[in-house]
Each structure stands twice: as C-alpha cells, then as structure tokens.
Amino acid sequence: MYVALYGVIIFVATFLGAFVGLGGGVIIKPLLDLIGYDTINVVNFISACAVFSMSISSTIKHIRAKTKIDYKFLLIISIGAVIGGVAGSSLFDYLLTIFDNTMLKGIQGLILGTLLVISVIYLNIKNAKKFNVKNNVGIVLVGLSLGFIASFLGVGGGPINVTFLVFFFSMTMKDAAVYSVGTIFFSQLSKLVTMGIKGTVPDVSAVVLIVAIVCAIIGGLLGARMNKRSDEKVIKTIFTIVVAALAVVNYYNAFSGLIA
C-alpha cells in the first residue's frame, strides 16, 4: 500500500517539478517524512533518485522540443552545483552522527519551510529587485549555494533554484524552471556519487526504488511538455499555491521533530 502511495506522490511531485520548476524533491521529502514509514536517510535517497531521474527525462524532453537553452551558462552554474552538492551531502552525513533521525528531520523542515516562505514572498512582489550576474565566478558561487542547499536538505531545491535564478539573473519564471531542472541534475548526481563513494547508500527496497524512478521519469516528461505549452502567469500561480502549501507541511514536520 505504501509503495503505491509513494508512487503517486513522486509522480505528482516530479510532474510539478518539471512543469513549474519545483524540482520534485521539495514535495517528495516533506510528504514522505510526514508519512513516517522510512528513516530520514532512506527518504533522502529515494528523493534524490526520483529527482535525478526526473531531471534526465525533463532535460531530454526540452532538448528534443528545441527549448532555447544557454548551455554555457548551464555548465558554469552546474559546476558550482556539483561542488555544493558534495559539501551539502557531507554536512548531512556529519549531522546524522550528532542528531537523531527525528531531530534532524525537524531542523531540515524548519530551514526548508523558511526558504519556501521567502521564495513565495519574493516572487510575488511586483517589480522586486533583481540582478543580472554575468561574471563566471559569481555564477559558480550561485550554483554552489543551490547545490549545497538542495543536497543538505535532501530535495531538488526547485523553488529555491527558481528564486535564485530570478533574483541573480533576472530570468522569467518559465525560463528559470528549465535551468532549475538542469542544475538539479548535477547537484543530485554529485550527491548520489558521493553516497556511493562513501558507502552511505541506505538499505532501500528495490521495488520502492523502481517505482520511484519510473514514476519520476513519466512525471518529468509530462511536466516538461506542460512547461513548453504554458504561459508565465499559469506557472507563477501554480508555483505559489503549491509552495505555500509545502511551507505549512515543512513547519509541521519541524514542530513535530523539534519537540519530540
């Protein structure tokens, strides 16, 4: 029963992830934490595998659809995302030796919930201040920050990615959604490789993993198609509603974890 529930959550999450730039993990992680069936490291791994699979299928869909992508920019920001992904994964592994599963889940929920609230507020401010960073070092540093946050929190980082891309590079939300998925690919790749090298891959049911990956691939393909067809207003509205709801879930997880 829980496998089917995981599949539905992952499909919806990755569909929205590719559609409006949510990434998927930002939905998967708090909802699987809320269900409470698996430990935090297992949830993080399932989320990373699902989001990584989504990013591959979604990016391939955009390439085939001839979506306009600045590959040089994507490569530069992804270099930072890889470095940040390794650092974030290492910090998570270290904190897991200090805090118990419930406490660390609460800390993650508090940080993610706060970042989501900031994202919703900023992206809905009319004529909000934006920058247009062109320097390669600056682009790498932004990517590093995104990779670190995503990897440490066990999410793709979609809403945070979109906010950073809009703020630092003056992108539209529609364009930011495409580049968000690209950076997610590299940050999650570095996280999974780091786990493999360190031998910290948790014991996960093969059935759960297969269901997660298949649902994520399908969600990524359909979400990328919808992104191509939809306008900025639709994407912004869906993004705002979903992220606001996720902030509430994360604060609930934080409250449950920190007072346990």
Regions inferred by a protein language model and the residue ranges of each:
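Generic transmembrane alpha-helix signature in multi-pass membrane proteins
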Residues: 28-29, 58-68, 150-151, 161-166, ...
